[in-house]
UniProtKB/Swiss-Prot annotation:
One of its GO terms (biological process) is mitochondrial respiratory chain complex III assembly. It is a single-pass membrane protein. The chain crosses the membrane at residues 5-27. The keyword Transmembrane helix applies. GO terms for cellular component: mitochondrial inner membrane. The keyword Transmembrane applies. It is found in: Mitochondrion inner membrane. The gene is CBP4. This is Assembly factor CBP4. It comes from the Eukaryota. InterPro entries: Cbp4 (IPR012420). Belongs to the CBP4 family. Keywords: Chaperone, Coiled coil, Membrane, Mitochondrion, Mitochondrion inner membrane, Transmembrane, Transmembrane helix.
Length: 143
């Protein structure tokens, strides 16, 4: 009797272990890395991801500061302090508005920087063409 119980439990553990091992291996070999995900994105989405990376990092740092402050306080966990409750509509709307403003400011700054670079490039090309024309033309020659 006892051997059949051990045999059954052995089968159960073997079946469970094989299911778990299969899941782990499938997860490991079918989940793309971050680099592969970025490579698969369209150029517009990849550019947007790169633009918003700093914003996400700043948001994460702010969250970590709030977590550190909450951890140091003696208040219960449900008293979130500076973190807005997800059930408060006015707080989350203000946060969303602030996030959208920051995002718009960042996009505007990047667009201005891109325009400045294009203008500098055009200015340099114009100067090069002007120098080339001046060097070819002899202004003091009569013929």
């Amino acid at each position: 009797m006892e051997s059949s119980g051990f045999l059954r439990w052995g089968k159960v553990f073997a079946a469970g272990g094989s299911i778990i091992l299969t899941g782990v291996l499938l997860f490991k070999y079918t989940t793309p890395t971050d680099e592969q995900l970025l490579q698969a994105l369209s150029p517009e989405l990849r550019l947007q991801y790169e633009r918003e990376r700093n914003l996400r990092q700043a948001e994460q740092q702010e969250l970590m500061k709030v977590v550190q402050q909450t951890m140091k306080s003696k208040d219960p966990i449900w008293k979130t302090g500076t973190v807005d409750s997800p059930w408060e509509r006015n707080g989350t709307q203000a946060t969303k508005d602030q996030f959208q403003r920051l995002k718009a400011d960042q996009v505007q700054k990047e667009e201005l920087e891109r325009i400045r670079q294009e203008l500098d490039k055009i200015r340099m090309e114009s100067l090069d063409q002007t120098d080339m024309i001046v060097s070819k033309k002899s202004w003091w020659s009569l013929w």
